[in-house]
Amino acid sequence: MAPKDFFPPAPLDLDWDNIGIKVREVNGHVECAYNVATESWSEPQVVKGIDLTISGLSPALNYGQQAYEGMKAFRDPQGQIHIFRPEVHAARMAHSCEVVSIPPIPQVQFIRSVALAVSVNAEFVPPFDSSAALYIRPLAFGSGPQINLAQPEEYTFCVFVLPVTSLLGTKPVDALIMEEFDRTAPMGSGNAKVGGNYAPVLRWAAKARARGYGIPLHLDSKTRTEIDEFSAAGFIGVRDDDGKTTIVVPDSSCIIQSVTSDSCVQLARSYGWSVEVRPIKYTELPEFSEVLAVGTAAVIVPIGSITRDSLRDLIVYKPSEDGGYPCADKLFKSIKDIQRGLGKDVFNWCVPVHEPGAYFQPVSA
């Protein structure tokens, strides 16, 4: 049976372009457990609902021993469902797990579990012509109950899914540089996707929003002279060198290795643009013709301005005469066309999803 014959059409009773990021019930999620004795993860199981049973004494809740990912699945015009760049997300998840002492999930198991979660929730994958996608949230954590600060006897790996639209939308947003808070320490865990890097940002992001800024921007915490990343997205600067386009990406050991940023780099090179991956000085910001916030949730969002209070700096990035940002628009269209099957996947980024039986076993209650 061909995948497009198995998967049901997306529900017609949802306003796909306006569903936002509200959590809603889906068919279920996937769980795996780690066996310390065999040093292996169990086969993925489908569990109904979106709730977990977890000990109040788990190191995940008490000491923050958890790591997660963010990725998406899409439907193409033929009805085929596929996941965008799961191998890269698997590698990043493995790195994050190692940082917080969780046994890494093997790539094959990670992709099987993710694909199974998408497959059993196939009707929640939006139509190809909507602005929505199926967001995928893999999560690993120490789950065995204990009070001492040591490796637990139990670990859990889960995959949740949720239909969403873009987190930041597609219009330009204004950024505020964080000067009273450092996102990460120079030799810390900033390059891992773990909750401890995000929860402390919440109150600062709320303060920025209250002042009308859509996203915080972080400088390096050691010297505060270089660009690291936005609080929920990677940073890309665009420079116009006498008609030749160059994109500049931060090279820092304290930032997440953005899958979307890497996709932009590969696309830029295919366009014939120059690419520089290096430390970016704060003083370079006025030299850019565009600045982009890039990430799985945000996709590609142009930055309208960057404010730094202590220096009373306001750096504005003006749109073109037609109101757009040419490089952001070009990259956005290329990525979205590949994701939705409207453009040729020359990089082999999209992995098709098949019926649940291809990934394995019965549903548990």
From Swiss-Prot:
Its EC number is 2.6.1.-. Induction: Expression is positively regulated by the oxaleimides biosynthesis cluster-specific transcription factor poxB. InterPro entries: Aminotrans_IV, Aminotransferase-like, B_amino_transII, BCAT-like_C, BCAT-like_N, BCAT_family. GO terms for molecular function: branched-chain-amino-acid transaminase activity. Pathway: Secondary metabolite biosynthesis. Keywords: Aminotransferase, Pyridoxal phosphate, Transferase. This is Aminotransferase poxL. The modification N6-(pyridoxal phosphate)lysine is found at residue 193. Aminotransferase; part of the gene cluster that mediates the biosynthesis of oxaleimides, cytotoxic compounds containing an unusual disubstituted succinimide moiety. The first step of the pathway is provided by the HR-PKS poxF that serves in a new mode of collaborative biosynthesis with the PKS-NRPS poxE, by providing the olefin containing amino acid substrate via the synthesis of an ACP-bound dec-4-enoate. Coiled coil: none annotated. The keyword Hydrolase does not apply. GO terms for biological process: branched-chain amino acid metabolic process. It is an enzyme of class 2 (transferase). Its cofactor is pyridoxal 5'-phosphate. Pyridoxal 5'-phosphate binds at residues 92, 229. Gene3D superfamilies: 3.30.470.10, D-amino Acid Aminotransferase, subunit A, domain 2. Belongs to the class-IV pyridoxal-phosphate-dependent aminotransferase family.
